[in-house]
Swiss-Prot record:
It comes from Candida glabrata (strain ATCC 2001 / BCRC 20586 / JCM 3761 / NBRC 0622 / NRRL Y-65 / CBS 138). PROSITE patterns: PX (PS50195). It comes from the Eukaryota. One of its GO terms (molecular function) is phosphatidylinositol-3-phosphate binding. Pfam families: PX. This is Autophagy-related protein 20. Belongs to the sorting nexin family. Residues 17-29, 95-122, 129-138 have a biased composition (Basic and acidic residues). Residues 1-12 have a biased composition (Basic residues).
């Protein structure tokens, strides 16, 4: 081993001296010329290459080889070719240097060729990685030589240095790609093509054995052929990277274009996505639930009740005024639709006064719920009194159904309004509404908005007259009055309005009477409690052993419990749905009133148009008459110059002074003659404007009649009748259940006798 080191040092000194001589001899060679091969240098390089396998000073050896070769392209290429051929001829197995392979990142292999690659990394690459510097070939810059490269060690390679440098680009490409072991979708039967796949086989021998099922000898021979082929056809590996970069850039542009197309498609299909909200919420069960209601005070302002809404896994806090604002916006955005109702704005104090006459007005929640709202899931704050709890539960019920009905509505859910309302990021709903440009553009009065699209209100709609809603419209429909036929009901509005009024009367009366029954049953329940307590006290005072009083006490207790269950069902499952039905009828009435006011609006426009036309005709006739009678002007002027007769004096000095002052004022006023032509021109412009307004209003009225009278109101009436049938069926079921239980209780008393 010592001999080998001495011979290596000697050869190193000899090679360095020869290299200096060769460098001095090549100074005058022009750039791009070829250098003749030096057999002595190649023989010494081969001998020195064999000694590299038994030494650790590899960095200095590579530098010596580069100094000997002089850095020219042809010398480096031939040196590498012979150096690789000598390594392949030896075909000796050497133990793998584990430390070197860990630094480079390659997998260990028993193949001699792969060991040579690892040694190449140890000699020339790993040492330079520590300094993080660039490896540059010493010599002249030859433009015709493709082997002269100056690149960074981290991911780039200088060509023509060693066998490891020759395969470095492919190794780097392998390490950055997904290997077969890492790819779960790899097809083992697919043929491997290209140098990249062969490089993957070199770095993953186990994977190559499983997929291609070849022995180690075949892989060794294949690797040797690959090294020889690459050494013969050496080219710049950076060109491959440039081609791949171009492909990546092209793919990036394609992906960007596809993303833009996808974004445009998503915007175009936003409405269809909103239409799927209804089916999505039903399948996923992501409906709105109000989980808590409690009093909240912000700063020094008065307290209010906040409702904590859970939707899609998030919690948002809203107050009653926020719900009221949301519904007012929906009424403006969808003027031809029945918007679900919300409870009337009623203070807690006023509601408490209204129910103050009821003894024990608090009702226990029933064991069963007839609709989708489960009030048992809503927590009422303990700071709320029993009298205030009823109105809070009432609001929780109606507001929950209000939001769920909005989500189930296809047209409303196609917009982002409901999602914005339920978004916890919009903590202050009032600020969100005032900062929205869409809401600020809406007209204050929906009678001056475009009924088809309120966000696209025209100048004609903005100038429409607003009827007075406080004035009674009378028995006759204004639209029928305009048509001139009171029996004309082509749209079915009169019959529809009568049907709605009949349904509204039934619901109101049913709610009023059932509320009275519920109140009486609630009082009867407390009477049963008093009777049970009286019989219990009587049984304690009875000297005899007669247990009849005890039986009466137990029976009245059971009847009280059954009555309490009945009262709870009647209040929450009958009275509350009936009250909600009244709210629904009010929403339909509001929609019918909108249709009627639009009819009055059209009537006013038509009436104003007819009056202006008559006035224009009168002026035109008067002008023609003046032209035919020229003396008429002199008569009018003489009449104008004639003194105004003095008014008859009234009795008393006070009235005489007033008359004198009035006469002086009349004499001082000069009567200016009107320009008939200007007046006619103004009337014609006004008539044109009214005709345009009449045409737009008539067209809107047709849309309103088709939507309200033929779709919305009939659908609402049909749903209301179905709800009323379900309510009455539940009412009969509750009464029947209570009657059966109460009958069994008293039958047991009769049998005991």
């Amino acid at each position: 081993m010592g001999r080998s080191k001495r011979s290596k040092k000697k050869s190193l000194a000899h090679l360095q001296s020869d290299g200096k001589d060769k460098l001095s001899s090549e100074e005058n060679i022009s750039r791009g010329s070829e250098v003749e091969e030096s057999p002595e240098n190649f023989e010494e390089a081969q001998d020195y290459g064999d000694s590299l396998k038994d030494t650790d000073e590899q960095s200095d050896s590579i530098t010596a080889i580069r100094s000997v070769t002089g850095g020219t392209a042809s010398t480096i290429t031939d040196l590498n070719n012979k150096f690789k051929s000598q390594e392949l001829v030896d075909n000796e197995k050497v133990e793998i240097n584990t430390k070197s392979t860990e630094e480079v990142g390659c997998k260990p292999s028993t193949d001699h060729s792969t060991e040579a690659l690892d040694e190449g990394h140890d000699t020339g690459i790993s040492s330079t990685n520590k300094d993080d510097s660039d490896v540059r070939i010493i010599g002249d810059d030859n433009e015709d030589s493709e082997a002269i490269e100056s690149v960074d060690i981290k991911g780039k390679v200088s060509s023509g240095i060693s066998d490891a440098d020759v395969l470095k680009p492919q190794e780097e490409l392998v390490h950055t790609a997904i290997l077969e072991n890492d790819n779960p979708f790899y097809d083992a039967n697919k043929e491997i093509s290209g140098s990249k796949k062969l490089d993957e086989k070199v770095n993953s021998v186990d994977s190559m054995a499983e997929t291609t099922k070849v022995n180690s000898g075949d892989s060794k021979q294949r690797m040797g052929d690959l090294v020889v082929r690459r050494s013969e056809n050496l080219h710049n590996p950076n060109l491959d990277y440039e081609e791949e970069d171009e492909i990546l850039v092209s793919n990036t542009d394609t992906n960007k274009h596809s993303k833009e197309s996808s974004s445009a498609l998503n915007n175009a299909n936003m409405k269809s996505f909103g239409n799927a909200v209804k089916s999505y919420t039903k399948k996923s069960g992501k409906h709105v639930r109000i989980l808590e209601a409690k009093k909240v005070s912000e700063g020094q302002s008065r307290t209010f009740v906040a409702y904590f809404i859970k939707y899609n896994g998030h919690m948002v806090r809203r107050r009653y005024s926020d719900f009221e604002s949301l519904r007012s916006i929906l009424v403006k955005l969808f003027p031809l639709m029945v918007i679900p109702p919300i409870p009337e704005k009623e203070g807690l104090k006023s509601y408490s006064k209204a129910i103050a006459g009821l003894k024990h007005a608090k009702y226990i929640l029933p064991s069963e719920q007839t609709d989708s709202v489960d009030l048992s899931l809503s927590i009422i704050d303990q700071s709320v009194s029993d009298k205030e709890e009823n109105i809070i539960r009432h609001r929780v019920r109606i507001l929950t159904k209000f939001l769920n009905r909005l989500l189930d509505n296809t047209d409303i859910s196609s917009t982002s309004l409901i999602e914005d309302f339920l978004n916890p990021n919009n903590s202050n709903w009032n600020d969100f509404v005032t900062s929205s440009a869409t809401f600020s553009m809406l007209p204050r009065n929906r009678l001056q908005a475009n009924p088809v699209d309120p966000t696209n209100t025209t100048r004609v709609h903005a100038c429409l007259p607003i009827p007075n809603t406080s004035v009674a419209l009378g028995k006759r429909d204004p639209e029928l009055f305009v048509s001139g036929n009171e029996n004309d009901d082509t749209d079915g509005y009169i019959l529809l309005e009568k049907e709605h009024k009949r349904y509204e009367s039934i619901v109101n009366n049913t709610y009023k009477y059932n509320r009275r029954i519920t109140k009486n049953f609630n009082e009867m329940k407390h009477d049963y409690d008093d009777l049970a307590a009286a019989f219990a006290e009587l049984s304690n005072l009875d000297i005899s052993s007669n247990p009849k009083h005890v039986d009466f006490c137990a029976t009245f207790d059971k009847s009280s419990i059954a009555m309490q269950a009945l009262v709870s069902n009647l209040y929450y499952n009958i009275d509350e749905p009936l009250n909600e039905a009244i709210y629904n009828t009010n929403a339909v009435t509001e929609l019918l009133m909108f249709r009627k006011l639009k009819a009055v609006q059209l009537y006013k426009v038509e009436k104003s148009l007819v009056g202006k036309v008559h006035e224009l005709q009168k002026l035109e006739k008067g002008e023609n008459k003046i032209e035919s009678e020229p003396n008429q002007e002199s008569l009018t002027s003489a009449r104008r110059l004639s003194p105004i007769p003095a008014p008859q004096k009234l009795g008393g000095s006070f009235f005489n002074k007033i008359s004198e002052i009035a006469n002086k004022v009349k004499e001082s006023v000069s009567y200016q003659e009107l320009d008939v032509e200007t007046q006619i021109s103004n009337l014609r412009k006004e008539i044109e404007r009214l005709k345009e307004t009449s045409a737009v209003t008539t067209k809107d009225m047709e849309v309103i009649n088709d939507t309200i009278c033929k779709e919305e109101v009939p659908k609402a009436l049909k749903c209301g009748e179905k709800e009323l049938e379900d309510i009455l069926a539940s009412y009969a079921s509750y009464m029947k259940t209570y009657a059966k239980q109460n009958l069994e209780y008293w039958k047991s008393i009769q049998e005991a006798r």
